[in-house]
Amino acid sequence: MFTARAGRTAASFNPGWGAPTRFAFFGEPPVPVLYAGETEEAAVAETILHDLPAGGGDLYPEDYRDTAAAALVTRRALRLAALHGLGLRRLAVTAAQLTDTSSAEYPRTVAWSGAAHAVRDDDGGLDGVCWMSRQCNNAKAYVLFGDRVGPDDLEIATDYARIFGVGADLDWLIDLAAGLGINVMV
């Protein structure tokens, strides 16, 4: 998911703009990041629907009309910190303490991303973090570190794209949201 504006693509890393997130921003200067979802539903839930209550609500055009989705293909194996399953147990934490928290905990959770970034070994270190999406917990979410994952490491798939502000993609969003008690205002 990305904002479809001049100069932005699905493979563009955020250089440190915007409000704090679960795993960004850290470092001085900030390490650029790219968030991604394993499925389109997870990506939508983690972005467009992120701030709506679990019980539903209204989604306004300014919240989705400039948003697009694309699929990314990795050109090399990425090394990711596993903040899910037994990865959490190895770190002696639970999802409720790290990946299933409210935004009030972001100043604390971002430190885990910084710690993953600080891991160094003969291969250079970790490329990002993987966890179960809080908003769609049957799919993984990812944050990639822009100083480790370069432009040659990601490819935008040519067989998938959505632009949520119009046509069939808006209809898809309306259908998905309706099942969640969310009214998409057009």
Model regions and ranges:
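Active-site and NAD+-binding cores of ADP-ribose-processing enzymes
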Residues: 1-22, 53-186
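Extended catalytic/binding region for NAD+/ADP-ribose chemistry, centered on the ART fold
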Residues: 23-55
